[in-house]
Amino acid sequence: MKRRNRAYRLLRLTAVYLLLLPFLLLGWLYSRLPDRVYLEPGQALLLPRFGWVEPMGLHGSQNAASTQVVGSYQTTLSLGGWLPIKNIRTVVTERAQVTVCGTPFGVKMFSEGALIVGFSDIDSPGGSTVNPAKAAGLRLGDRVIRIGQIRTENNDAVKEALEAARGSAAEVIYVRSGEQRSTTLTPVWDAAAAQWRAGMWVRDSSAGVGTLTFVDPEKGVFAGLGHPISDGDTGESIALRSGEIVPCEITGCSMGTVGSPGELKGKFLSAHAIGSIRINGENGVYGTTRTGFSGQTMPVAFAQEVETGEAQILATVAGETPRTYHVCIEKISDANPRRNMVIRVVDKALLTRTGGIVQGMSGSPILQNGRLVGAVTHVLVNDPTRGYGIFAQTMLEQAEQVATAEK
């Protein structure tokens, strides 16, 4: 009897799972499908990565996804043309053409506020050690934007504000994790340094080397890196006050190994800016330029056109001239906008030279079927032959926002 009851419960549980399975699969599919799709006029909506998914009405009524008219439309994606899964936005637009670069560039950025990158205790007149910044609750990575009545736009302004307080409590306005906060800090006199101090080290600027992905010469905008410029000590994305890009050449490379990513080494060739940075965002560095850049004019692929399989990257690992290297796109995903692709380097020349993907190659264009499909963003620390990439379409959208703002 007990055995029969156990079998009955198991059968009932199995039936429940079987009933829930289709809904779970539809939920998974919903989360994987894009929210927006771009098409050329007259181009039908095809999703190669989801061959069984197609727009509703494909077998009957007009398919808005293949309209000839430029504009934005709502499209219902379905399973086999009959079971609705998700409503998405279909944008019909002319395909963009950009100058694909792959050239190195130097970055000089000044942050909005002074970033806390370290702490050091101070010997007080009473003989004990104190740290006013820590006592005020400040942390590594906080961005100080005002002390007292003085805006702390740079390191000198922080020093000036502490001198102005002269040991009195001063209100500190700072930003942590995107949220503005306030606290009170009381500077102490450092007899050894002969100045008022808070016990914190701050940084107001950053410099580095990256790779230029593309330039739109008609709109006068550029895109690079594919990820934000972050502070080397805190890992925090730098809030942009102003910035520029300058000519650069690659002078050396440390090879990447398992657990230790390699790095391109470069030097600035000139102090003359070739572009102004307008955005330091999650999807890269974007700005304006009137400089003519060498490169090949190529169409930008829509996200749904990117395929797994053979591809190429344009990367500069020596000097100023990019070369084409063979890679394989192993995985594609719409779920994480900063990690749309997993790519693997298969080019023997690049593997011999760098060990795979190294720091400084971020922004290297990914090409497939004669189109710009994306850019390299990160290396997998435990496997330097592999890395992540971002869709070129995403970077183009951000660059077009810069162009619109400059009008």
State where each predicted segment sits.
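Hydrophobic membrane-insertion alpha-helices, especially the h-region
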Residues: 9-28
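PDZ domains, with a preference for the canonical peptide-binding region formed by the helix
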Residues: 66-68, 146-179, 383-385, 390-393
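Conserved PDZ fold ligand-binding element
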Residues: 133-156, 366-369, 373-378
